[in-house]
Design a protein with these regions (language model features):
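A short, proline-enriched helix->beta-strand linker immediately N-terminal to the Walker B motif
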Residues: 115-119, 352-356
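Conserved ABC ATPase signature
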Residues: 96-100, 104, 333-337, 341
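Transmembrane alpha-helix interface motif
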Residues: 419-453, 457-462, 566, 570-656
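Hydrophobic anchor residue at the start of the ABC signature
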Residues: 110-111, 138, 347
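Conserved beta-strand-loop-alpha-helix hinge in the C-terminal portion
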Residues: 174-199, 397-400, 407-421
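Catalytic Walker B motif of ABC-type/P-loop ATPase nucleotide-binding domains
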Residues: 121-125, 358-362
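Conserved ABC ATPase "signature" region
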Residues: 75-92, 223, 314-329
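ABC ATPase C-loop
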Residues: 113-114, 145, 350-351
Length: 656
């Protein structure tokens, strides 16, 4: 069944209701599937793939559903392998899924749903972030992978699915059904109504109009890349690109081809490894991220248009408010707008800066025909004002409307793999052994009674640190908070202790307290800093037999915490591009912190839903895709822990 409807009509809500993930507030459901008799009997793919990823590696992410179904390890591996192949993931399963591109993440999330082998498969725009060729492969894979399942697909682009579905249901406002039946019959009988509802385009996309003085030869070059490569970010082939005044350039290519890298290089967020990048000054560049909420900083829609100090033309801002169709929402809170309204607001706010260069990342993803047309109209407004526009997109209508088109080649599968994670001796130890090391060291630190004993007690930690640190920088970053805390404790002890303030005797007492706190915390921080969150969960669930659900929930949270830095970078860079301050501006940092908190809370809610969509809610008993073995090395680790326990006491005895 194909589920269609305008943006905000309730398609995602209907899918969640079918999956049993919503509580009824009013009315009653008839003909709904019975409650699942096993975890994963119903599989739901959410619209935002980043919220559907729950593990530290691609393998464990795809295995999450089969684990909830308590399958054996051999069957889990088989299902994961088949699902990865069916979804055309094509990247190393040991990689972190959040390091993948948006299109790759969408395929990973799809693989996680297919691995459930569900009887009812619910897909929310499963190919929205994919290039046409890959999207066709994924559609074929979905149909092949679920031959006996009931399939319900929510989609804005109907044409590719129509030959494969038996029923077309179209939703109007508030999820009310306005059409239901065999696809050809519905399209024939209600074509005009579907066009009016934004389900079908109003007509074929018009070719781009040639604007006076903006032909390719006449237009001046606004920004350019010459022989640019950034191999570390997927852009391996030398790239040449010219963006000209008043022209719209569409940037396309399969997932992982380097589209985001091209955008980041033009914006100055990534430096080319080879070649040169020429761009306007920062005040003349505007960008619209794929998630428009990352760019919002004001309390109202009207204030958002003039939030940037570079948006000085107030009449222009008012005009853009009208052109974007947001005048009636001028006093609304930006975060409360619909997805299409948020995208139009982000584009209008960017245009209010009167930029020479406008860069957009997938501005029409998840939008219906009317809202896609509204976005194209705003981009036409930008080029009419002489702005050079670059848009990374898979939208065929937007590509057809572009003046220029640059298609990046598919990444070379035979190219060099990403550098492997550096192995260290601590990797040979079970996570529980590393936890034991930290606990025993903390207990032993209470034996420190003098500054001499405290310094001597740190000797084993100093000698063992290289065996637990993957990089010098990473180890130093983990130790900085401890050292700052120790310095603060030494200062306050010397100032406020029993000895005369800041006297020689007081400083020695402060040194003792500082050494004790370092001995208490540092071994555990260094040991556990190398532990993979998923491996720790395996150990807690299998070795200590802790309840699986809280263990898994904690592991998912730890994985997300490890990627907060990426969210922080996106949020702060977006604000810096709008001229709202430098990376060290207190005002910018305060606003970015609040935005990160809001983004994290919303993401956590969506992730909980994604976990339940893969059987987590009903997983009273679950299995683990990988074992958590104990080896001989763990005996050595336990011995080191015993040394850390008794050494501070021995050190104290040695110094007398």
């Amino acid at each position: 069944m194909l589920l269609a409807g305008a943006s905000g009509s309730g398609k995602s809500t209907v899918l969640r209701a079918l999956a049993g993930l919503l509580d009824e507030e009013s009315g009653e459901g008839t003909g709904l599937p019975a409650p699942p008799t096993r975890p994963g009997e119903t599989g739901l793919l959410l619209q935002n793939p980043a919220h559907a990823l729950v593990a530290a590696t691609i393998f464990r992410d795809v295995a999450f559903g089969p684990e909830n179904a308590a399958l054996g390890r051999a069957e889990i591996r088989q299902r994961v392998s088949q699902a990865l192949a069916a979804a055309r993931v094509g990247i190393d399963p040991s990689r972190a899924p959040l390091d993948a591109s948006g299109g790759q993440q969408q395929r990973i999330a799809l693989a996680g749903t297919l691995a459930l082998d569900p009887d009812l498969l619910l897909l929310d725009e499963p190919t929205s972030m994919l290039d046409p060729a890959t999207a066709q492969q994924v559609r074929e894979a979905i149909l092949e992978a679920a031959p006996g399942a009931t399939l319900v697909i929510a989609e804005h682009h109907l044409e590719p699915w129509l030959p494969h579905v038996d029923r077309l249901v179209v939703l109007g406002p508030q999820a009310r059904i306005i059409a239901d039946g065999e696809p050809d019959s519905v399209l024939r009988a209600q074509q005009e109504r579907l066009r009016a509802a934004g389900v079908l385009p109003a007509g074929p996309a018009a070719p781009p109009a040639t604007r006076p003085g903006t032909g390719r030869q006449a237009a001046a070059v606004t920004a350019s890349l010459h022989r640019v490569t950034v191999p570390s970010r997927g852009l391996t082939a030398p790239l040449d690109l010219e963006l000209r005044t008043g022209r719209l350039t569409a940037l396309t290519g399969p997932s992982g081809a380097g589209k985001t890298t091209v955008l980041r290089t033009l914006l100055g967020d990534a430096d080319p490894t080879t070649g040169t990048a020429v761009r306007p000054e920062p005040a003349r560049i505007a960008a619209v991220p794929q998630n428009p909420e990352h760019s919002f900083v004001a309390a109202t829609v009207r204030a958002e248009l003039t939030a940037s100090p570079w948006a000085e033309d107030l009449p222009l801002a008012e005009q853009l408010l009208e052109r974007a169709g947001l005048a009636r929402l001028a006093d609304a809170q930006p975060h409360r707008l619909s997805g299409g309204e948020q995208r139009r607001l982000a584009i209008a706010a960017a245009l209010a800066q009167a930029p020479q260069l406008l860069v957009l990342d997938e501005p029409t993803v998840g939008l219906d025909a009317h809202r896609r047309e509204a976005v194209r109209a705003l981009l036409a407004e930008a080029t009419a004002r002489g702005t050079a526009v670059l848009v990374a997109t898979h939208d065929p209508e937007l590509i057809a409307a572009a003046d220029d088109h640059l298609a990046l080649p598919a990444p070379d599968p035979s190219g060099p793999p990403p550098p492997p994670r550096r192995r260290i001796p601590a990797d040979a130890l079970n996570p529980l052994t590393l936890c034991l090391l930290g606990i025993l060291a903390a207990i032993g630190s209470f034996a420190v009674q003098t500054w001499q004993g405290g310094l001597l007690a740190l000797l084993p930690t100093v000698l063992l640190a290289p065996f637990a640190v993957r990089t010098l920088r990473g180890g130093a970053l983990r130790l900085v908070p401890i050292l700052l805390s120790a310095a603060g404790l030494a200062w306050t002890t010397a100032l406020l202790g029993d000895a005369p303030a800041l006297s020689h005797e007081a400083w020695l007492v402060g040194l003792k307290e500082a050494a004790r706190i370092i001995a208490f915390v540092a071994p555990g921080v260094l040991a556990l800093g190398s532990v993979d969150a998923t491996a720790l969960g395996d150990a807690l669930g299998q070795r200590l037999r802790l309840p699986a659900r809280p263990v898994v929930a904690a592991v998912v949270a730890l994985v997300r915490v490890g990627h907060l830095g990426r969210q922080w970078e996106t949020i702060t860079q977006t604000r810096i591009r709008r001229g709202l301050g430098s990376a060290r501006s207190p005002r910018l940092l305060a606003g970015a912190t609040l935005a990160l908190l809001v983004d994290t809370l919303r993401g956590a809610e969506q992730q909980a839903l994604a976990m339940d969509a893969r059987g987590f809610a009903g997983a009273d008993q679950r299995s683990w895709a990988e074992p958590s073995p104990l080896h001989r090395a763990d005996l050595l680790g336990a011995g080191i822990g015993a040394l850390l326990l008794v050494w501070p006491l021995l050190a104290q005895l040695l110094v007398g």
